[in-house]
Amino acid sequence: NINFLKDLKKILPNFDITIVSSVWENQDELENFKEKYNVKFINILKEKDWTNYISKVKYVTWEENSGFKVPNIFHMWHSILENIKFLEKLNNEKKEIFDFVLRFRTDIICKKGLKFLESEINSLKDNEILFPSNLHWKGLNDSFFITNFSTILGFKDFFTFLDEFIKDNRVFNPEYILYSFISEKNLKIRLINEFDLALIRVEDSKPTKTVFIPFKDKIKMKFAKQKIKLLKFQNKLKQVIK
């Protein structure tokens, strides 16, 4: 959805936006993608075999295979982490300066709230991450987030965390995994005021693994949901006080 990127550029005229992407070596219409999004730096990846990791996933939430697919979560985070390493390489070798890093999927649209984005980014501090104000059901949605360059480098050990997460038979849900990782890293979660997104996709499939949420994960998910509600309330309160 190129319109979302165009909207971002319009609302952030004071930012020099550089598109850096890591894509699969067998990616369809790669040249079209590069031209459409004006990709400045591109990193070609080989797809990894995650079969061994996937076989160890014991529990999932009911959204599995419809809202998310287990193999795709591994592929997604592999590409995100490789892109982070690529950013670091560009910074070290080409002296490219990245003040902030925005991760976003190309199948999202903004429903409202873009007007608050610039001020939220400008007030972003170390160890803080900005998320949209909606689409958080079991933790934190991973389709869009912003942090500064030094903070994103701390994500490089994500798979070490995920390996322990799976060994501990935690429930596998991408939102809950991201929330748990950020909690373990002691990063501060911030919601962009009234910044609502929507995903352009429709799927309807049954889960492939056991749908079950261990008690400790239920508690943490409820805590995450209440935390999101509190952050939304705090944003509204700030607007009233202004």
Could you say what each language-model-derived stretch is?
Residues L5, L30-K40, F116-I121, I177-S183:
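Short, aromatic/basic amphipathic alpha-helical patches
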Residues I241-K242:
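Terminal low-complexity segments of carbohydrate-biosynthetic enzymes
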Residues V23-E25, L102-I108, L135, T151:
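Short, flexible loop/turn elements at secondary-structure junctions
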Residues I17-I19:
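Hydrophobic targeting segments
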Residues I2-F15:
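Short, acidic, metal-binding catalytic loop of nucleotide-sugar glycosyltransferases
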Residues S22-E93:
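Active-site-proximal specificity loops/subdomain of glycosyltransferases
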Residues I80-L130:
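GT-A fold catalytic core of metal-dependent nucleotide-sugar glycosyltransferases
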Residues I73-M76, I84, N91, K95, ...:
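Catalytic core and acceptor-binding pocket of nucleotide-sugar-dependent glycosyltransferases
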